[in-house]
């Protein structure tokens, strides 16, 4: 599995894009390796678990959340991931399959405080809110702390202040920007693979825009030169419409 993944990383690097996230089968193999890690691969395995498994309700996220929950409850062990670290990592998964284990851990005397800290930063809990509320009503101190934190929006107020000033470098795009400029229909096959699909943005030549391969790959080097100036880069078009498909393309590609 590790050899195949490293080969995949090299293939993606040749395209100028990051590797794809692990799928559920790869994540299951990763879990097995984490339980009995090969010598010399420890740091790589932990990095894959922490950074290369998608969050939310992806099937790979289900495998990851189940493994971390088992570690936290002592139902599984890994020499590389402690119970405490497992709870922390559950808290980085945004919502979805990580929520139920964290709510359950509010009743764990050893880990309740850590589970509460994780839930305080998790908003996509949906009906699990009522489970936390019920525990709070029953006197669970950790659950009460979570509700209080949500009520005070600590997930937001704990963030850094918005800077008084933001210095940007302008990426000027002449003419009208339509949906096809950002997300070409001819490249619709790659839309699920956002980094790869983004390579096709502005692939057709226009005044001031210099694609890598006209008709195939957009102005990647031109954008990299702007990034190298050290500022955030702002897309500034003469005309950028506000249709929903354009917003979707902007959200994904830009």
Regions found by a protein language model. Give the residues of each.
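Amphipathic alpha-helical packing elements
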Residues: 2-31, 36
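Structural detector for internal amphipathic alpha-helices that build alpha-solenoid repeat scaffolds
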Residues: 15-20, 42-59, 80-95, 101-104, ...
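Amphipathic alpha-helical scaffolding segments comprising HEAT/armadillo-like alpha-solenoid repeats
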Residues: 24-31, 55-74, 93-107, 125-136
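Short coil turns that connect the paired helices of HEAT/ARM alpha-solenoid repeats
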Residues: 35-40, 73-81, 105-112, 135-139
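Active-site-adjacent structural elements in folded domains
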Residues: 71, 83, 218-221
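Short, charge-rich binding segments
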Residues: 77-83, 87, 92, 224-228, ...
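Fe-S-dependent hydro-lyases/dehydratases of central metabolism
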Residues: 117-254
